[in-house]
Amino acid sequence: MKRKPDIWSKNPDSEDLKAAGHYLSLIMAEHQFSSLITALRHAPTIMHDAKDLLRASQTHLLPKDNPHVAENLKRIKKGKKLSPVLLIRGNAPKGITLTIADGHHRICASWYWNEDEPVACRIVEFVKPHKPKA
C-alpha cells in the first residue's frame, strides 16, 4: 500500500496565529487570549487523529464542498503543507470542550484526504492568568 505524503508543516503560519487571536478575543478577555497565543507560538507540534479532535471539540465534519475545506484539499493535492491546528485543551470534569482556536477546516480536509491521517496540532492549557493591575 502506497503511503500518502506528509501534509503538515511543523510550525503554524503567522496568519493562523493571528486568526486564532481574533477568535479567542471573542470568547475571553485580552489578557487571557494574548497569553494563550504566546503559548501556542512556543508549544511543540504533536499529532492527534482528526476524529478525536472533532469529538473532543464537539464540532462536526464540514462538507467536502465547503469552500475552505475544498481549498485545503487543493493545497494538499498540490503538495503544499498545511499549518498545524491551534487548540486550547478542554476540561471534561468541568464540561469544557476542546477549543479549536484555528484550523477546523484543515482538520476536515485532512479527514477527507485520509481519515487515518494524524493531524499536526499545537495544544495549550487554559490557565487563568492574573488580570493586569490598572
Segments predicted by a language model, with ranges:
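Short alpha-helix boundary/capping and kink motifs at helix termini
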Residues: 40-99, 111
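An acidic, glycine-rich, mixed-charge low-complexity segment common to nucleic-acid enzymes
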Residues: 1-66
